[in-house]
Every structure is written in C-alpha cells, then in structure tokens.
Amino acid sequence: MERRGLAGSVTALIFAAFLFGILAPPVAAGGYDNALNGVKQVQAVFDMSQGSPAVSNAIFWAVKNVYEDATVRGLSAPPQVAIVFHGPAVRLISSDRSGFKKEDYAEIDKFQNTIRHMKKDGVKLEVCDYALKVMGVDPATILPEIDHVGNGFISVIGYQAQGYAVVRVP
C-alpha cells in the first residue's frame, strides 16, 4: 500500500510540474521583458573614445555580448551593431604602440583580436580620420578591418538617423 502511495505521489508531482509548465506565463530570457517589449531588432552604434586598453577590454566584452545575447538573437530580425572610434580610442586600433607601456601590449593585442572577431561577426567598424590627425596617429597603421570616415560624429549621427541607439563609451 505504501508503495502505491509513493508512486501516486510521484505521478502527481510530474503532472503538477507539467501543468505548471503549460499554464505559467513565459519568462523572458535574460530579464529584458521590459526593455525589449515590442522590439523587433536591436540596432546600436557604440561611440567609442575610451583609450585605456584594460578598460576597453572589459567594456568590449559587454559590447560583444549585446549582439551575442540569446534574447537579442531571438528577436524577429538579427542585431545590427556599429562601432565608431575617435579620441584616444584610435590609438588602440593602431599597430603603433608608442605612448603605451610595455605592460599594456598584451591588453592591446587582446583588444585588437576582439575587434577582428567582431568584424567577422558582421559588426561595422569605423575610425574617424579627423581624430587620427588630432591624436597624431598615422592612418596607415590602423587595423585593415576598420573603415575610415572623415568625421566620426557624422557617422554616429547617420546611424542614429537610421534608428540605431547611440551608446557612448567615454
């Protein structure tokens, strides 16, 4: 008798779990149910001026996560991400390491590898030629994965006019 009671309890628990699974409201993955309510696609342009290699690596982990996130990828249209480099950030995407300490080189290499992977992932990458001039960076030293634009602010404005959200990375 006790054996049938245990089997009945297990069956009841399985049935309850099944029923709860069907009747429970869906939970948005990642907890973005408010932020992404009604959103069909994530479009973001990152306005990048941060010049610290270590800080930039930490930030770019999060930037990469924006378009790799399962919830974002689950929207009806794939994410579109652009990054516009200007200010001190232009030094991070250059093969010229002058002005950096040797202990920064590994962080710069890591950052540049992240940029290469982002390009392969379809991220649009642009550098402001005006910023290169102001920062004294030779345009020929910029990673080949990055497109040159005359004025990065015009690019940011253009992306915003196309519906991209602007995210400043000071």
List where the protein language model places each region.
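Bacterial N-terminal signal peptides
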Residues: T11-I22
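Secreted/extracellular ectodomain signature
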Residues: V27-P170
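N-terminal secretory signal peptides that target proteins for export/translocation
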Residues: M1-A7
